[in-house]
A protein has these predicted regions:
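N-terminal signal peptide c-region/cleavage motif recognized by signal peptidases
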Residues: 18-20
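Bacterial N-terminal signal peptides that target proteins for export
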Residues: 1-9
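Hydrophobic, well-ordered secondary-structure elements that form the walls
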Residues: 293, 314, 336, 350, ...
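Gram-negative/organellar outer-membrane beta-barrel architecture
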Residues: 25-185, 284-285, 345-349, 353-369
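Gram-negative bacterial Sec-dependent N-terminal signal peptides
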Residues: 10-16
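C-terminal outer-membrane beta-barrel translocator/porin domains of Gram-negative envelope proteins
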Residues: 25-28, 36-40, 86-90, 105-109, ...
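Short Gly/Pro-enriched loop/turn and capping motifs at secondary-structure junctions
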Residues: 300, 315-320, 339-343, 355-358
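A short alpha/beta connector and helix-capping loop motif
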Residues: 324-336
Length: 369
């Protein structure tokens, strides 16, 4: 399973602006709109991630949601010293009620660390020993078939290409060779099922989010044997008060791979999307699991927005056949959040997570989940 993506949350959240303007009505509300986007986030291994983009929205005849949305964004990470470029499209009109999505990406941010394979790998060497300079290219069209208003099935082909140099002195170079290093291309198919009843995506207070994704790759291009992966994730949100004064957020997820898998497609746990307080891609295995809990409290309502605090606890691990380990890697911490102009879609969160390996700071739009 490839590492979870790191799209700039601010750029994604701001695509809602066009729909909100149309909902307000007015003579120009339904005209095509092009909106500039700006975003930033911070995590220890990526550094300061700065992004710019643009979203173009077109509507049917006085109808929501938009018939077409086109998004282009580019981001640069100061810590990883690399970039990410995304171009995406959402097309509703040609295939109603089916939705066509097209995603293309060129990125050096998808895979930045490698510590070896297993649940007990050590991280005591200098940071440079674990760095990976991998560039990934992705082309991924898919169709989404609504089964209900909140449940949808997606399916489509995948084309991936990765270039990974084996820099001297790194774990990747000294403990290899690893299948998938160098230049590696793969072609496959992805299918997913998603249930989403959340009231907001950036800062949910109520609802559930369930997703299951399977990927399969035949022995085509550089893949010498077929391989595949399956992953699942579930989150739920329980709140008191309206607007919420306290929210308990829970999430659990896991993944497994089968077949002869290139090293970048293993299951990875650690970092800002799974277990905070650990480095990105800290632990690699053929199976993995993680869990997260956050308690988010409203501290006060100020003229410019709502402010609050939250506590967090993360846990996760991986499994490989040749290793017998019963250790779960855990981290705990807390942080502050601000909902600008009292709107949850404008939520900024700052989190500090402490693990046995380090204390890490994360700044992002919205919450981790």
């Amino acid at each position: 399973m490839a590492p979870l993506t790191r799209r700039l949350p601010l750029l994604v959240a701001m695509t809602l602006v066009g729909g909100e303007m149309a909902a307000q009505g007015g003579p120009d509300a339904w005209r095509p709109q092009t909106v500039p986007l700006f975003g930033a986030s911070y995590s220890p291994d990526i550094g300061l991630l700065l992004g710019v983009g643009v979203v173009h929205t077109r509507y049917g005849f006085r109808a929501l949601p938009p018939s077409t949305q086109l998004l282009a964004e580019a981001a640069y990470a100061t810590g990883a010293n690399t970039y990410r470029i995304d171009v995406a499209g959402e097309f509703r009109r040609p295939l109603l009620p089916t939705i066509l999505y097209v995603e293309m990406r060129a990125s050096g941010l998808e895979f930045t660390r490698f510590y070896g394979v297993g649940n007990t790998t050590v991280g005591s060497q200098p940071d440079s020993a674990y760095r990976v300079r991998q560039t990934q290219l992705l082309v991924a069209p898919r169709v989404a078939i609504p089964l209900t208003s909140r449940l949808r099935f997606t399916v489509g082909p995948l084309l991936k290409y990765a270039h990974t140099p084996g820099d001297p002195g790194t774990v990747l170079a000294t403990t290899g060779p690893y299948y998938g290093a160098g230049d590696f291309g793969q072609v496959g198919v992805r299918a997913g099922l998603e249930l989403d009843t959340r009231d907001h995506t950036a800062a949910p207070a109520r609802g559930v989010h369930l997703s299951m994704v399977g990927q399969g790759y035949p022995a085509v291009w550089d893949a010498v044997h077929p391989f595949g992966s399956v992953s699942a994730e579930a989150s739920t949100y329980l709140s008191a008060g309206d607007p919420p004064s306290a929210t308990l957020a829970l999430r659990a997820g896991g993944a497994a791979v089968s077949g002869t898998v290139p090293f970048q497609e293993l299951v990875y746990v650690g970092g800002g999307t799974t277990v905070r307080g650990y480095a990105e891609q800290r632990f690699a295995g053929r199976r993995g699991a993680y869990g997260n809990v956050e308690l988010r409290l409203l501290a006060g309502r100020l003229p410019f927005g709502d402010v609050g605090i939250f506590g967090l606890a993360d846990v996760g691990r991986v499994w490989i056949p040749a290793e017998s380990s019963d250790r779960w890697h855990a981290a705990a911490g807390g942080g502050l959040w601000l909902a600008w102009q009292h709107r949850r879609v404008n939520t900024l969160s700052i989190a500090a997570a402490r693990s046995p390996e380090r204390t890490a700071i994360y700044v992002r739009i919205g919450f981790m989940f």
